[in-house]
Curated annotation (Swiss-Prot):
It comes from Thermococcus kodakarensis (strain ATCC BAA-918 / JCM 12380 / KOD1). Its EC number is 5.6.2.2. The lineage of its organism: Archaea, Methanobacteriati, Methanobacteriota, Thermococci, Thermococcales. The gene is top6B. The keyword ATP-binding applies. NCBIfam families: PRK04184.1, top6b. InterPro entries: HATPase_C_sf, Ribosomal_Su5_D2-typ_SF, Ribsml_uS5_D2-typ_fold_subgr, TopoVI_B, TopoVI_B_transducer. The keyword tRNA processing does not apply. It holds the Pfam family HATPase_c. Belongs to the TOP6B family. This is Type 2 DNA topoisomerase 6 subunit B. SUPFAM superfamilies: ATPase domain of HSP90 chaperone/DNA topoisomerase II/histidine kinase, Ribosomal protein S5 domain 2-like.
Amino acid sequence: MAEANQLFKEFKIQSVSEFFRRNAAMLGYTGKVRSLTTLVHEAVTNSLDACEEAGIPPYVRVEIEELGNEHYKVVVEDNGPGIPEKYITHVFGKMLAGTKAHRNIQSRGQQGIGISGAVMFAQITSGKATRVITSTGNDEIIEAWVKIDVDKNEGKIVKKEKHPNPKGWRGTRIELEVKNVKYMRSKQGVFWYLKLTAIANPHAHIELIEPDGKLIVFPRSSDYIPEPPVEMKPHPKGVLTDDVYRLAKKTRRNTVRRFLIGEFSRISDKKVDELIEYIAALRLIKTVEDKKLQEQYYQKLMEGHVKAVLRAFKGYTKVVKQVAKMMEKPPEKLTWHEAEEIVEAFKYMKFLAPPTHGLRPIGEENIEKGLKGILKPEFVTAVTRPPKVYSGGIPFQVEVGIAYGGEIPAGFDLYRYANRVPLLFDAGSCVTTQAARSIDWKRYKIDDLDRAPLVLMINVVSVHVPYTGTGKQSIASVDEIYNEIRLAIMDAARRLQTYLSGKHRKLAQVKRRKTFEKYVPEIARALSILTGEPEEKIREYFIRFIESKFASAEVEEVAAEEVAENA
């Protein structure tokens, strides 16, 4: 039998970077077109987030240069706040590092993998370092070539130069050389990604230089810069035991009571007193041997009758005092079991819904501006639903835009977004697709959806978008999100229905008018023979009569539409 030491001779600890190097497909680097789009997406996402957090109207320029067969140089430049020199290796060379991953805050990137994953993909396909040029607007520009040490999950600068900055340039430019990718103008390519990004971010000016040198500009159509999202405290209904235990070890609060009030939303002194009772009640219920009676107590607790449950046990005040004492000890001394008790009690308690002030939707006006500016439709409308929560305590918000006709070609298109970021892949498994296809579009005057000149835009906003995978291209089918998407679509579709109904009525009126006008000459000729009146005079009379009748009908129709809109 082999010895244990021999069996474990090949045992090796794998770094996060090494894991993702071997599993790049998990980050979206699968397929030649998709890999290039993913790489551009990660860089553009970083640029937009940085500009908005600094209150700067984003200017993003993307250049794709073909160096050989399936071999490109990708350049992304922005006018953001720049990156301090000491953070360059962390931003571009360390997985699970960033300004967002550890915060309960809405952002385009959430996992701290994005741009460093792009650097790694470029490195493993071309062997080249990523060139970074950046300045915070001070007197120097930093030029650095960054590589990732996959064994240590660390970035390293293989070459660095400093240049004077007499004009005070501020921003970041990155150049990545990448192989085994392909540029195509498909609906999964870079052009399409930037087009959809421009629609959801009308405050951004975006430029693309394609491999053939063609310049495409998506101009800024709104001067409004979204306010930076606000970090939100975790809600009691959305936390795990590990969350409470880990936060307790890190907090600066001096008691468990102060910790709970200060680190979580919707917890006050009064709520902590209530929590004490629930924990005490749960401790007492677990001492009951009769399972049927135990279930009855749990049911009463779920209904909020905590005091009645406590009074059912002799000496319950002693247990309440023990729990109250726990609330006054230092948080760092909180045990795992005590954290479990707190989270279990949370499940039975009632809390106000989490605050939603930290969510930053695009907004109805800006959705309409984005759709009009890029698609040039004949009709556009947008709906932003009120914030809701899923999984008991995670806030989210759904927005929908509909664009119809005009320069939109025949054929239904669904534009999917999460926190303003286009989702181009894995549409079949996405809750947005499922919700859109569940709608009976015929009710809204769309008889053949697949041939209609219709674009449906759906944006899901949340501090934690429930993606189906690390590639972040598909949103999981969560009931609360699914229902909100359906409600938003139906609201917008009713407005489209009103527009199409009016359009159909007008077309019918035009047809009727042409029918009447067609017979005017013949009628005028016959009446002229019968009455002796001039034919021209009779013809003019009938034309004026038809015009007055249809004009009054149009006035009545406009009035009816106004009443319907205000109803």
